[in-house]
C-alpha cells in the first residue's frame, strides 16, 4: 500500500493523504461471504444514544472473516486481496483445495497466487496458522487466540504484530503491540507475520466530510457546553474545568482511571501491564 497526496487546490485536498489502493486486486466482495450490517447509529433497542459520535455514513456489507483458521491441513490459494470497509487491514480471499472459500486478514507480504495452510505441521511461512507451541521464539505473529478454538481475538489491526518471547510449561509468553507481556495457552493458534497495510496510520482524511462518510459524528468538547450538558461546561470565556480533574459527561473521573476489573482471573497471566498513555 502507498499513501496518495494531492495538489493543494482546495482546503479538502491540501491536508489529505489517503490510500492509493494499489494492492487491491478485486473490487466486488464474494457474495457468499457477506451479509447485511444494520447500522445502529449508536442507539440501543429503545432508541437511546448509548455510544456518542456515531451516525450517518455509507452503507456497508459485513465480510465474514475466518478468525478461527479451523480448516486444518488443507492448502488454500490466495485468489484476491480486497478492501474491507469494516477494518483498516486488507482481507485475502482464499480458495481451498476442497472448493470452499474464506476470507482471512491479509498479512504483509501475502500476494495473489500464494498458498497458505493451517495446522500443527504447517511450514513457518507468512499467512500460515500454527499452535503457539510450534512457533519459534522471536517470530512475529498476529490474529492470536486467547482460548483454544475460540478464534483470534488479539492483534488484528493494520500493521500490528506480536512477538513470541518465551515458552514455559503449558504457556507461551507473548509481547503485544501495546508492550504488554502476557502468557497464553500453548494450544492457542496464531498466524505467522504482521498484519498488512501498515501505512494506514499515516492517512489524513483532510476534511470533515470524509469522517462523516465513515459514520463518525462531531466530537464536541465539554468545555464549550453549558453546565447542564457537561461537568466542564459554563463559565465566562475559556474557563478552567473547575474540578479536581477531568470528568466524563456523567461526572465520573476521566483520563487515567483504570477500568479493568481487579478480580479478573486472567490478570494472573499478565506478566507486565501495557504502557499507559
Swiss-Prot record:
Region annotated Disordered, chain positions: 28-55, 207-277
Pfam families in UniProt: Ribosomal_L2, Ribosomal_L2_C
Compositional bias of kind Basic residues: 34-43, 209-220, 255-265
Gene Ontology cellular-component annotations: large ribosomal subunit
Keyword Ribosomal protein: yes
The keyword Ribosomal protein is assigned to this record: yes
Highest rank taxon of the organism: Bacteria
A biological process term (GO) from this entry: translation
InterPro entries: NA-bd_OB-fold, Rib_uL2_dom2, Ribosomal_uL2, Ribosomal_uL2_bac/org-type, Ribosomal_uL2_C, Ribosomal_uL2_CS, Ribosomal_uL2_dom3, Ribosomal_uL2_RNA-bd_dom
Alphabetized UniProt keyword annotations: Ribonucleoprotein, Ribosomal protein, RNA-binding, rRNA-binding
Cystines in this chain: none
UniProt-recorded Gene Ontology molecular function terms: rRNA binding; structural constituent of ribosome; transferase activity
Family per similarity comment: Belongs to the universal ribosomal protein uL2 family.
Assembly behavior: Part of the 50S ribosomal subunit. Forms a bridge to the 30S subunit in the 70S ribosome.
Cited HAMAP family: Ribosomal_uL2_B
Function summary: One of the primary rRNA binding proteins. Required for association of the 30S and 50S subunits to form the 70S ribosome, for tRNA binding and peptide bond formation. It has been suggested to have peptidyltransferase activity; this is somewhat controversial. Makes several contacts with the 16S rRNA in the 70S ribosome.
Protein name: Large ribosomal subunit protein uL2
Origin species: Microcystis aeruginosa (strain NIES-843 / IAM M-2473)
Amino acid at each position: 500500500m502507498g499513501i496518495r497526496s494531492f495538489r493543494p487546490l482546495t482546503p479538502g485536498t491540501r491536508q489529505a493523504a489517503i490510500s492509493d489502493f494499489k494492492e487491491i486486486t478485486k473490487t466486488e466482495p464474494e457474495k457468499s461471504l457477506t451479509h447485511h450490517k444494520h447500522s445502529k447509529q449508536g442507539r440501543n433497542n429503545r432508541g437511546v444514544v448509548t455510544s456518542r459520535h456515531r451516525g450517518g455514513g455509507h452503507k456497508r456489507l459485513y465480510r465474514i472473516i475466518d478468525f478461527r483458521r479451523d480448516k486444518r491441513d488443507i492448502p488454500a490459494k490466495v485468489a484476491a486481496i480486497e478492501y474491507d470497509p469494516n477494518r483498516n487491514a486488507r482481507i485475502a480471499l482464499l480458495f481451498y483445495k476442497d472448493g470452499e472459500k474464506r476470507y482471512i486478514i491479509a498479512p504483509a507480504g501475502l500476494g495473489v497466487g500464494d498458498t497458505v495452510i493451517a495446522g500443527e505441521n504447517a511450514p513457518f511461512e507468512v499467512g500460515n496458522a500454527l499452535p503457539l507451541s510450534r512457533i519459534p521464539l522471536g517470530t512475529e505473529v498476529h490474529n492470536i487466540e486467547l482460548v483454544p478454538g475460540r478464534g483470534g481475538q488479539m492483534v488484528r489491526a493494520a500493521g500490528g504484530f506480536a512477538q513470541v518471547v518465551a515458552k514455559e510449561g503449558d504457556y507461551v509468553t507473548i509481547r503485544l503491540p501495546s508492550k504488554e507481556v502476557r502468557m497464553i495457552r500453548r494450544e492457542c493458534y496464531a498466524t505467522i507475520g504482521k498484519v498488512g497495510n501498515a501505512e494506514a496510520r499515516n492517512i489524513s482524511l483532510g476534511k470533515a466530510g470524509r469522517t462523516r462518510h465513515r459514520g463518525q459524528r462531531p466530537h464536541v468538547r465539554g468545555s464549550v457546553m453549558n453546565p447542564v450538558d457537561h461537568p466542564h461546561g459554563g463559565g465566562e470565556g475559556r474557563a478552567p474545568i473547575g474540578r479536581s480533574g477531568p470528568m466524563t459527561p456523567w461526572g465520573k473521573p476521566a483520563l487515567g482511571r483504570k477500568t479493568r476489573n481487579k478480580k479478573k482471573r486472567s490478570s494472573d497471566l499478565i506478566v507486565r501491564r501495557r504502557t499507559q498513555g
